[in-house]
Amino acid sequence: MNERRVALITLSSGYVGPPLARLLAASGHDLVMHLPNDASTMVQGSDPTPLVDELAALGAAVEVVGDVDLRTSEGNQAVVDVALARFGRLDAACFVTGSIITGKFLGSTLAQWEKLKSVNLDMVFHALQAALPPMIAAGRGQIVVFTSATGARPEPMVSLYGATRAGANALVRAVGLEHAKFGVTVNAIGTNYMDFPGFRQATGADDPERRAVIESQVPMRRLGSMEELAEFTAVLLDGRSRFQTGQFFSYSGGWST
């Protein structure tokens, strides 16, 4: 049995994945890193080889999983099974989900609704069903699901997106309460106004003038960094915070308050 803690991070080559993996590796975690197998989400990354080498230099054993579809039960079970087969345990799981479609509600299509639901809501359902059983059996574990602060603050032009995110937030909170008695924590972090390629491309924030307008909408008057988001997430994942569960945390610079 592996004595180091083991953490799983999905869609790990982009978004919060690299800085979070570094923090967990440095704090004594081995890692299972899932990489996207298509362009169905807004979280895209790059060649993971340098990151894997960097994590190994920090003392982490790393298992990379690629060819799975996390919109399915089978895909989520596969990444959990890899963790158990390689390391014999799963202590922490961070599930990154996200696809966005904007537009007027009456101009929306059923196909758009089904796409958003499959990534933003169904993926969360499948992830929780796969990760919970081994943690319950071990009597310990931490799960964090990334959603969106938009699920807590409805806005026009993103009704489908906001609805699927709100559903994911509610699911995570209820599942966290239901499984607290087993020593497993389940929490959601909903982000907005984060400085990463997906957000900048969607909002035009790569343009300095447009970015200034966007930042003026945030109470903190700036975009959040992936490094500070990773620090916040690590506290919920690394075993230090075992009395916090069933919560939705908005990480948006005060925007959703």
Q: Residues of each region from the PLM?
A:
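Short, small/polar-rich loop/turn modules that mediate ligand/substrate recognition or access, typified
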Residues: 180, 185, 244-246
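A glycine/serine/threonine-rich, flexible loop-to-helix segment
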Residues: 43-47, 181, 193-218
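Active-site helix of classical SDR
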Residues: 128, 164
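Substrate-binding pocket helix/loop in short-chain dehydrogenase/reductase
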Residues: 104-105, 112-117, 210, 214
